[in-house]
Amino acid sequence: MIFTNNIAAFQNVVLVKKVKIVLLIFYGSIMFSMTQVNKEECDYYQNLNLGEIYYIYNPRYPLPYSGSKCTWTITSYHRINLKCSLVEFSENKNCNAGSLTVKKNFANKYCGNITLNIESTSNKMTVILTPPGRFFCEVRPIKRVKDSTNCNCGWKNPSRIVGGTNTGINEFPMMAGIKRTYEPGMICGATIISKRYVLTAAHCIIDENTTKLAIVVGEHDWSSKTETNATVLHSINKVIIHPKYDIIEKDDWQINDIALLKTEKDIKFGDKVGPACLPFQHFLDSFAGSDVTVLGWGHTSFNGMLSHILQKTTLNMLTQVECYKYYGNIMVNAMCAYAKGKDACQMDSGGPVLWQNPRTKRLVNIGIISWGAECGKYPNGNTKVGSYIDWIVSQTPDAEYCVIE
C-alpha cells in the first residue's frame, strides 16, 4: 500500500501486490520502507525506530473498504503509541459488522464512530481491520521514562573452572536462588531482571508459603560462607504468578509457567551481582540451533545428589517441529533444548536459559527452566520469555530494563 501525507491524494491510493512496497511518508525528512508479509493477503510488517512515524489506513481511503481482512504488525525497541483520528464502522454490541482490533498484551475490538489513543506495554502492536469500514491512524515509538539504551545487563565474569560443570565463583551475576528460610539449600532457581524483580517458574512457588521464602543473590556454594562476599538474602515483598498458569497433571507439563518475585529492598548491582538482559530485540526468535547455558543447584542426576555448588551445562535449542514431537501444542509459548547426557534436573526449575548475543556478548534470559523427563533422556521444556515480554513489563511498571541487549 502506498502512503502519503497529502489527504487530497488519498483517492488515488491503490493496493499494490508486491513483496516489497516502498512507502513515501514525509514527516520532515522521514522516509522508510515497509514489507508486505504475504503478497496474497493484506498483511504488513514495520519495525520503527525512535523519531519515525508510520501512517496506516484502509485501502481506498478516504472511501470505506469492504475487501479482505488486513493486518498491520508494528515492532520497535520501545513501546508503541497508536493514535487514530478516524475510526468509522457500524456500531453494534459485539462489533461484528466491521471493526478495528488492536492487540497489545491483550486484544480490544472497536467499532462505531470514535477516535483512539493507545499505548502498548511492550515493543509490539498488531492492528487488524475487519471490513466494512474505514480508519486512519498514526503510529510512533515512544520511550518509557524507565526504558534505557545506555545501560548494562547480561555481563559474565571469567571462570577459573576448566572442563567441569561447576560454575566459577559469581561467574553468572544474574543467577538467583529461591530458598525456604528454615532450611538450607535452594528449592528453585531464579534470574535477576531488575533491581527489585527476579523471574522464576510459577510451579516453584504456587504451593509454597511465600512468607517463609527468600531470594538469594550472589551465591555460589550454599554450604559455605567464605567463598564469596557477594551473597545477600532478600525478603519477598510481592509475588506475581501468571493468571493462566496451569499444569497437565498426567504428564507434569507446565503451561504459562512464569512468575515474578519483588524484593523488599533494591538488589545492589556490581561486578558479582546484576541483571540478565531480556529478549526485547529477539522476542520472536526460536533460537533453534543455538547453544544455550542452563544453571542450577539441582540434582546432578535423576533422583541423584543435590549440588551445593552452582552448576552449568550447555544445551542446544531445538526447532518447534522437534519440540512438537515430544510435547505437542503445549510448546506454543515454550521451547525445548537437548544435549545427550546433559540437562537441567530436579530443583533447577525456575533458573535461566541463557543465550549469548553474538554481537554484544551479553547474556539474554530467553527461557525459564520448567519441566523435563528423567534429566537428560529427553529434551527439556522451558517457558519462552519472549512470549511474555508484554506481561513482564505490564506487571513491573517501576522497573527499568535495558531494551538494547
Swiss-Prot record:
Signal peptide per UniProt: 1-35
Major localization listed first in the record, in broad terms: secreted
UniProt-annotated location(s): Secreted
Tissue specificity comment: Expressed by the venom duct.
Domain of life per record: Eukaryota
Biological process per Gene Ontology, one example term: proteolysis
GO molecular function: serine-type endopeptidase activity
Record SMART domains: Tryp_SPc (SM00020)
Xref: InterPro entries: CUB_dom (IPR000859), Peptidase_S1_PA (IPR009003), Peptidase_S1_PA_chymotrypsin (IPR043504), Peptidase_S1A (IPR001314), Ser/Thr_Proteases_Immune/Dev (IPR051487), Sperma_CUB_dom_sf (IPR035914), Trypsin_dom (IPR001254), TRYPSIN_HIS (IPR018114)
Disulfide bonds: 42-70, 95-111, 188-204, 323-336, 345-375
Gene3D superfamilies recorded: Spermadhesin, CUB domain, Trypsin-like serine proteases
Pfam families in alphabetical order: CUB, Trypsin
Domain named CUB: residues: 42-147
Annotated active site: 203, 257, 349
Alphabetical list of PANTHER family matching this protein: TRYPTASE-RELATED
Family: Belongs to the peptidase S1 family.
Name of the protein in its database record: Venom serine protease 34
Organism field: Apis mellifera
